Curated annotation (Swiss-Prot):
It comes from Vaccinia virus (strain Western Reserve) (VACV). Induction: Expressed in the early phase of the viral replicative cycle. One of its GO terms (cellular component) is host cell nucleus. This is Protein OPG036. Signal peptide: none annotated. Plays a role in the inhibition of host innate immune response. Within the host nucleus, inhibits activation of interferon-beta promoter by inhibiting IRF3 activation.
Length: 175
């Protein structure tokens, strides 16, 4: 990479640094993961749906146990209930992923979450996007309790349209 290319991107890099989530002391996040998260947030902002829900979600995923227990935010309290949904849905897969993470803590893990497909009465299939996003949020929340760097799993597994449905659900329920 040439220095001129670096100079051209300097304002963008500085903007990403200032917008980056502050991590707990001693933890670090892979720049590729931050790029993935920032791209998703920028896409959401460009599509003009509420980025405040995304900010609340990102903050929730970085909160420690004491902060979660002392929160007054109803949205975060709802996000906390998603962990049990993830355990019920993914069960042994949660344990398998946690085992892999403990076994190789410094390795980047590719985590693909499956969707439960429901058969309609017209013999077609559908996935409830809101329920799927809830389960992914719960799954990521469980992973982040072990090490708070797994937020990228949310953005790698959830499509824009699914995320939009979830945002609409939260906005309708709380705003």
């Amino acid at each position: 990479m040439t220095s001129s290319a670096m100079d051209n991107n300097e304002p963008k890099v500085l903007e990403m640094v200032y917008d980056a989530t502050i991590l707990p002391e001693g933890s670090s996040m892979d720049p590729n993961i931050m790029d993935c998260i920032n791209r998703h947030i920028n896409m959401c902002i460009q599509r003009t749906y509420s980025s405040s829900i995304i900010a609340i979600l990102d903050r929730f995923l970085m909160m420690n146990k004491d902060e979660l227990n002392n929160t007054q935010c109803h949205i975060i309290k709802e996000f906390m209930t998603y962990e049990q949904m993830a355990i019920d849905h993914y069960g042994g897969y949660v344990n398998a992923i946690l085992y892999q993470i403990r076994k190789r803590p410094n390795q980047h893990h590719t985590i693909d979450l499956f969707k439960r497909i429901k058969r309609t009465r017209y013999d077609t299939f559908k996935v409830d996007p809101v329920e799927f996003v809830k389960k992914v949020i719960g799954f990521v929340s469980i992973l982040n309790k072990y090490k708070p760097v797994y937020s990228y799993v949310l953005y790698e597994n959830v499509l824009y349209d699914e995320f939009k449905c979830f945002i609409n659900y939260v906005e309708t329920k709380y705003f």
